[in-house]
Amino acid sequence: MSVSAHDWPQFLGPERNGVYSGPPLASSWPAGGPRKVWRKPVGQGFAGPVVAGDRLVLFHRVGNEEVVEALDARTGDPRWRYAYPTGYRDDFGFDEGPRAVPVVAQGRVYTFGAEGQLHAIDLATGQRIWSVDTARRFQVRKGFFGAAGSPLVEDGRVIANIGGEDGGKDAGVVAFKADTGAILWTATNHQASYSSPVGATFGGKRTAVLLTRQGLLGLDPASGAVLFQRTWRSRSASSVNAASPVVIGDRIFISASYETGAALFRVQGNTLTEIWSQDEAMSNHYATSVVYNGTLYGFHGRQEFSPSLRAVALDTGVVRWSIDRFKAGTVTLAGDKLLILRETGELMLAPAVPDAFRPMAQAQILPATVRAHPALAEGFLYARNSDTRNNELVCLDLRPQ
């Protein structure tokens, strides 16, 4: 089964940048909100769904199992189910399901569970192809909130920020052979973050770009050689790097909360040049910002303190507009519009413009709390909630009616 540019096969979409490139969406919704196509009860977890062709892949926890399910994307009907035991317990009382969004590539589904269980599953049949217990294999210490970064899968490699070691050698980042799970290389002593790596090309050279617990890191995906790095983390031990790097041409935008802030760098060969950095513009706690026409759109501030929704000039870091105490959420760029899903379960549509925030449509689509990033494919939105007794996954038709 091939993956098209209109699918949503991984975290943050086809290019892992939060951009939807499918058919246009409606500019307004009925009074009751977008048409609900189907909904399905789901288990625990912060992992959003992914869509490839007519398949939706859901990764959640049901009882004491982490479960991977394939559904018909248009009807919600089950296709297959794959499960394995889990004993993960959250030390802070949060949801105990998986955090990392699955990846669909080359006819396989890759999942990375809360305890570091990395699995490759056949997309057509649901049969296990290979699996690695990365926590045990690489002696990974339990982090604050479990394993959360979705692996980067490209060119026959699965690259993950494991944060461990391999027989005395550093294994902060590990590359596995995509078809067999064999270890290709291990690199760096960087601990695991909650951010997902992205693939980028600088000066004709393919690069794996990561924001680990220690900071920004660029690796040669073929060998694991370090191409560039820059420390970027809070002085507080009880802090996280969670938003993914955003690549814009030869520049990389990174952001974190906990008095860390944001920075924009230019990549020239193996050299990083800082363009600007500050903590007052766009400190992303969990959700990754999107870029449109030279403006960043995203959340500024800690999730638990009701962050602001902001527009920030990419070139300078100047704040163009800010909606204070907006509540946390996720933002997706669809054409020239922002699709915002708040933790409260409210979906909003607004033009991506730097002069003011002007919502065009809004609707309550799920009960709180919604932390998982939604999937948007062929004009259909797939979103799920968690932290309730009645978690559900919903499919909405956002196409013009």
Residue ranges and their predicted role:
Residues V3-Q401:
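Noncatalytic, solvent-exposed loop/strand surfaces
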